[in-house]
Design a protein with these regions (language model features):
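Extreme N-terminal starter segment of soluble prokaryotic enzymes
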Residues: 1-5
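Short catalytic-loop micro-motif centered on adjacent basic/acidic residues
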Residues: 6, 35-38, 115-117
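A short, glycine/small-residue-rich beta-strand->loop->alpha-helix junction that serves as a flexible
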Residues: 8-20
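Conserved nucleotide-sugar phosphate-binding/catalytic loop shared by glycosyltransferases and other
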Residues: 10, 33-93
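A short, Lys/Arg-enriched amphipathic alpha-helix followed by its capping loop at the start of a domain
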Residues: 21-34
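An aromatic- and histidine-rich active-site surface loop
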Residues: 44-47, 116-128
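Conserved nucleotide-sugar donor-binding subdomain of glycosyltransferases
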Residues: 77-118
Length: 128
């Protein structure tokens, strides 16, 4: 069995849409049995659970760091302050990144993916 880890950045919906199209193409192209796991947070997790209700054990919530929303997109000032300070129920960005990389590493070690695909997720690149 071929095991794939798909890591989807949760800010906006473009990352999710691209990964779902890619996932459909992979299922069409790869012959044989594949085991796909998804990782993200917030609204993307909700979409994944709705789309794959029978695969809850393969949907992993990892709290990926994202910008703090402002009125018309990301709030640059709040996101910059969040580097060191907790802002709007978000722990400091440094703490978020450390926790995020730790959780992602645990998932990699546990699942032993044959292939990792990410869209907007920086952790896979750092851990590589």
């Amino acid at each position: 069995m071929f095991k794939i880890g798909e890591f989807i950045y949760p800010w906006g919906s473009g990352h999710y849409s691209r990964m779902m199209r890619l996932n459909d193409a992979l299922l069409d192209q790869i012959k044989g049995e594949i085991d796909v796991h998804f990782s993200s947070k917030d609204h993307v997790i909700e979409k994944l659970l709705k789309k794959f209700p029978d695969k809850k054990e393969k949907i992993h919530e990892i709290l990926m760091p994202t910008p703090i929303d402002g009125k018309f997109g990301p709030s640059v000032s709040k996101s910059l302050m969040n580097i060191l300070l907790p802002i709007a129920n978000n722990p400091s960005l440094i703490r978020q990144i450390v926790n995020y990389l730790r959780e992602e590493r645990k998932l990699y070690n546990k699942e032993k993916f044959d292939l990792v695909i990410n869209d907007g997720d920086m952790g896979s690149n750092i851990l590589a």
